[in-house]
UniProtKB/Swiss-Prot annotation:
<protein>
    <recommendedName>
        <fullName>Probable alpha-L-glutamate ligase</fullName>
        <ecNumber>6.3.2.-</ecNumber>
    </recommendedName>
</protein>
<feature type="binding site">
    <location>
        <position position="262"/>
    </location>
    <ligand>
        <name>Mn(2+) 2</name>
    </ligand>
</feature>
<dbReference type="InterPro" id="IPR023533">
    <property type="entry name" value="RimK"/>
</dbReference>
<dbReference type="GO" id="GO:0009432">
    <property type="term" value="P:SOS response"/>
</dbReference>
<feature type="binding site">
    <location>
        <position position="260"/>
    </location>
    <ligand>
        <name>Mn(2+) 1</name>
    </ligand>
</feature>
<keyword id="KW-0464">Manganese</keyword>
<dbReference type="InterPro" id="IPR004666">
    <property type="entry name" value="Rp_bS6_RimK/Lys_biosynth_LsyX"/>
</dbReference>
<dbReference type="GO" id="GO:0018169">
    <property type="term" value="F:ribosomal S6-glutamic acid ligase activity"/>
</dbReference>
<feature type="domain" description="ATP-grasp">
    <location>
        <begin position="104"/>
        <end position="287"/>
    </location>
</feature>
<dbReference type="InterPro" id="IPR041107">
    <property type="entry name" value="Rimk_N"/>
</dbReference>
<dbReference type="Pfam" id="PF18030">
    <property type="entry name" value="Rimk_N"/>
</dbReference>
<feature type="binding site">
    <location>
        <begin position="178"/>
        <end position="179"/>
    </location>
    <ligand>
        <name>ATP</name>
    </ligand>
</feature>
<dbReference type="GO" id="GO:0036211">
    <property type="term" value="P:protein modification process"/>
</dbReference>
<dbReference type="InterPro" id="IPR011761">
    <property type="entry name" value="ATP-grasp"/>
</dbReference>
<dbReference type="GO" id="GO:0005524">
    <property type="term" value="F:ATP binding"/>
</dbReference>
<feature type="binding site">
    <location>
        <position position="260"/>
    </location>
    <ligand>
        <name>Mn(2+) 2</name>
    </ligand>
</feature>
<feature type="binding site">
    <location>
        <position position="141"/>
    </location>
    <ligand>
        <name>ATP</name>
    </ligand>
</feature>
Length: 301
């Protein structure tokens, strides 16, 4: 197969590993920076130009699109789909998962467990919003935040009101969620490929830090997940329409709660924590499921 990896940096661990595993299995692999692509959008003969070269004859595209370039990156991915190239994760599924509010609404529709979450637009609604999620402490999240940036733990009602009003004053869209104290600053990253959880790790936040993101100094370790956690992760990935996903769960007194479904999960943490060849598993799944023009939208909403 001829595989395109959409990534802005060929030296990133995840990109390197996908290239290595693709080449090891006899495939031709090319790393493409989506921001350097231009598109000829026609119904008869859609094309993508890259550094004055026309990209042709690709069988598969593996998107590794960062949150900051979601709009243009998914536009390029859609163009590949228009050309009949099989996407490991389709453009619609990625945009679903990148919209925190939309993704939570889709998960709620499927009956997936989540922290109680509130959303409002006006400062007048703040008292009702806090009451809705059970009062302080609460977690306040920017809808556009990634890697733990734009996430605040407000331990008192007064602090919560101040933070929410400040964000609203900046015209920022936010979610307010109940704080799951029993999680102890840890979460579970379940790596889903197809309809299976192929690896899982526990991420523990640094001392005094409630966010468990590895980018925020958290640590990762191998973990055994329960059948309920496995089912929840698979259901969450399917709700987004994602073939490859990192599903972040919190362990709570009422069962697993989904925090986020990541459409471009990093490979370094999960491979180091579990010792599994996750990149190879992605290529293996692609080999088994690839078909030309197999670009029909999965999932609904």
């Amino acid at each position: 197969m001829k595989i395109a990896v959409l990534s802005r940096n060929r030296h990133l661990y995840s990109t390197r590993r996908l290239v290595e595993e693709g080449i090891n299995r006899g495939h031709e692999v090319k790393v493409i920076d989506c921001l350097h692509c231009s598109m000829n959008i026609t119904s008869a003969d859609p094309k993508i130009h890259y550094h004055e070269e026309v990209l042709e004859d690709f069988d598969v595209v593996i998107p590794r699109i960062g949150a900051s370039v979601t709009f243009y990156g998914t536009a390029v991915l859609r163009q590949f789909e228009m050309m009949g190239v099989f996407p490991v994760n389709e453009s619609v599924a990625i945009t679903r998962s990148r919209d925190k509010l939309r993704s939570l609404q889709l998960l709620a529709r499927k009956g997936v467990g989540m922290p109680v979450t509130g959303f409002a637009n006006k400062p007048d609604n703040v008292p009702e919003l806090l009451k809705m999620v059970g009062g302080a402490p609460v977690v306040i999240k920017l809808l556009q935040g990634t890697q733990g940036i734009g996430v605040v733990l407000a331990e008192t009602r007064k602090a919560a009101e101040s933070v929410i009003e400040a964000f609203m004053g900046l015209k920022a869209d936010i979610l307010v969620q109940e704080f799951i104290k029993e999680a102890g600053g840890a979460d579970i990253r379940c790596f889903v490929i197809g309809d299976k959880v192929i690896a899982a790790m526990k991420r523990q936040g640094a001392e005094g830090e409630f966010r468990s993101n590895l980018h925020r100094g958290g640590t990762a370790s191998l973990v055994r997940i329960t059948p309920e956690e496995r089912r929840t992760a698979i259901t969450a990935a399917k709700a987004m329409g994602l073939n490859v996903a990192g599903v972040d769960l919190l362990r709570s007194s009422r069962g697993p709660l989904v925090m986020e479904v990541n459409s471009s999960p990093g490979l370094e943490g999960i491979e180091n924590a579990t010792g599994k060849n996750v990149a190879g598993m992605i290529i293996n799944w692609t080999e088994k499921n690839y078909k030309p023009w197999k670009t029909k939208t999965r999932g609904r909403g």
